[in-house]
Amino acid sequence: MNGPADGEVDYKKKYRNLKRKLKFLIYEHECFQEELRKAQRKLLKVSRDKSFLLDRLLQYENVDEDSSDSDATASSDNSETEGTPKLSDTPAPKRKRSPPLGGAPSPSSLSLPPSTGFPLQASGVPSPYLSSLASSRYPPFPSDYLALQLPEPSPLRPKREKRPRLPRKLKMAVGPPDCPVGGPLTFPGRGSGAGVGTTLTPLPPPKMPPPTILSTVPRQMFSDAGSGDDALDGDDDLVIDIPE
């Protein structure tokens, strides 16, 4: 009878042991999952750093290539500049000059002849013509002749006598009849008497057309009595401008 009881006790223990192991496995699984997430984060960070470093390395390689190209061009330029003086140092072979032929004109004869017909002279040597002019070969002109021919200019200019101006016909603008037309007209004078005005004789009044603007208002406008057929009847807001 102890056997079956012992068997039941064993099953319970096994169940408890298995349950304990299962909990431990679940806990380990969660721990490993957390470790896996951390490892993935580190891997992502490392991959980003790798791409960044590769880009920087590519930039440095491009700069190195450009500098190497510039060094190569500079070295080629230096080699060219060094080669040119060597070529210039070697003297060029001199050509033998052929004797000038009789018919061929010389370069000195190709120069244009002077327009005056006299031979050209050096600039430093004075010509005899100029020296003869500079010498006092001829007597000077008499002072009386010079005074008659060339009078000394006076500091003040002589005032010119103005001719009397003829009266001009003035164009008068057409205006109201109240404007005076006749009367003496004064104009400022010029010259010495600038302050004194010169008077002109009055001109006869020109023939003017009859004025279109009435200086006086007709009495019919002020009268109350009027024709019944007037087109302006009942218009109290009528404004009439009366010229003063």
From Swiss-Prot:
Region (Disordered): 63-236
Amino acid composition bias (Low complexity), ranges on this chain: 99-115
Protein keywords: Coiled coil, DNA damage, DNA recombination, DNA repair, Isopeptide bond, Nucleus, Transcription, Transcription regulation, Ubl conjugation
Covalent link Glycyl lysine isopeptide (Lys-Gly) (interchain with G-Cter in SUMO2), residues: 159, 171
Coiled-coil ranges from the UniProt annotation: 10-54
Record field: compositional bias (Pro residues): 202-212
GO cellular component, one term: nucleoplasm
Location in or out of the cell: Nucleus
Pfam family, one: INO80E
Biological process according to GO: chromatin remodeling; DNA recombination; DNA repair; positive regulation of DNA repair; positive regulation of DNA-templated transcription; positive regulation of telomere maintenance in response to DNA damage; regulation of cell cycle; regulation of chromosome organization
UniProt feature, compositional bias: Basic residues: 157-171
Location, primary (coarse class): nucleus
General function of this protein: Putative regulatory component of the chromatin remodeling INO80 complex which is involved in transcriptional regulation, DNA replication and probably DNA repair.
Quaternary structure annotation from Swiss-Prot or TrEMBL: Component of the chromatin remodeling INO80 complex; specifically part of a complex module associated with the N-terminus of INO80.
Protein name per UniProt: INO80 complex subunit E
